[in-house]
Amino acid sequence: AEIYQATGVPYHTESQHSCGFARLCGLNNARGKYHINIDSDTLYPPYYVETMVKALEKPGVVAVSSLWSYIPDKDHSWLNLKLYEFARDVHLYLQSFKRPELSVRGLVFAYRTDYARKVGIRTDIRRGEDGSLALGLKKYGKIAFVRKRKARAVTGYGTISADGSLLNSFKVRAIHALKGVGGIFSKKEVYKDEDDNLINP
């Protein structure tokens, strides 16, 4: 907050802690036609906003999502990360045709403000609020995906570190993807909430 105050940048404080409440606070205070998520732990390329807006301005498009990379470190080599990202990107691409809501990630998500307000952002779940929003936005138009480097963000390891090593993280996600491979070829309009994902079950 001190940095925003010193630079004169408008900001809003959300006292309720969760990604859903933070996203909803931003949406409720948005004043533009398009709402572009920007995460504080993520680096974005110079023309990220322009690239996302250009995609949003195409006829019939109500939301767009792009891809992201990780910075190599002593525990994650450049080659292993590239292989991991390639496999993940291919899966997200194939999945995006029939079930784009499963390929959306909040750190690289942008959408029409008016439609998003009609759908709303869920605050009763621990994860998946962005995908849930995308699911609701589908009835208003297309969820597009930007594959350009100009829209590729760089972020921390977050959830992939939760499963231990990069290899183990890949195994966990590969098994999950294989179990749901049939979903790549069919649309889905309703998803059942898992009990462990509900904040107040």
Report residues per predicted region.
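Acidic donor-binding loop at a coil-to-helix junction in glycosyltransferase catalytic cores
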Residues: 126-133
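Acidic helix N-cap motif at the loop->helix transition within catalytic regions
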Residues: 1-6, 47
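Glycine-rich, basic loop-to-helix element that forms the pyrophosphate-binding segment
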Residues: 3, 14-30
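Short aromatic/hydrophobic "clamp" motif used to bind/position activated sugar donors
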Residues: 35
